[in-house]
Amino acid sequence: MFAVIETGGKQYLVKEGSIIKVEKLEAEEKKEVEINKVICISNSGLSYSSNATVKAEVLEQCRGEKIIIFKKKRRKNYRRKTGHRQYITVLRINEISLQK
């Protein structure tokens, strides 16, 4: 059984037991979070208003890989190099359920 969930403005295809990295969630490590924005489950096209939920455990709160931003204007000796690391949450999907 698989589900497509939405969190942090992005969509993720998840299965039970899979580990995903999502945008930062306000949850402590080793706690369980419940995601209600389920777009579809298995092969049925269920919408947001369906009674589907996905339960996941927060494995860690960390930062992603560094992204380099480099700006340059040719012939003007203008160069700026900065970096950014986004805060992410690592989740393990425990249960995909559909309440009737």
Swiss-Prot record:
This protein binds to 23S rRNA in the presence of protein L20. GO terms for biological process: translation. Signal peptide: none annotated. The keyword Heme does not apply. HAMAP family: Ribosomal_bL21. The gene is rplU. GO terms for molecular function: rRNA binding; structural constituent of ribosome. Transmembrane segments: none annotated. PANTHER family: 50S RIBOSOMAL PROTEIN L21 (PTHR21349), LARGE RIBOSOMAL SUBUNIT PROTEIN BL21M (PTHR21349:SF0). GO terms for cellular component: cytoplasm; ribonucleoprotein complex; ribosome. Part of the 50S ribosomal subunit. Contacts protein L20. This is Large ribosomal subunit protein bL21. It comes from Wolbachia pipientis wMel. Keywords: Ribonucleoprotein, Ribosomal protein, RNA-binding, rRNA-binding. InterPro entries: bL21-like, bL21-like_sf, Ribosomal_bL21, Ribosomal_bL21_CS. Disulfide bonds: none annotated. Belongs to the bacterial ribosomal protein bL21 family.
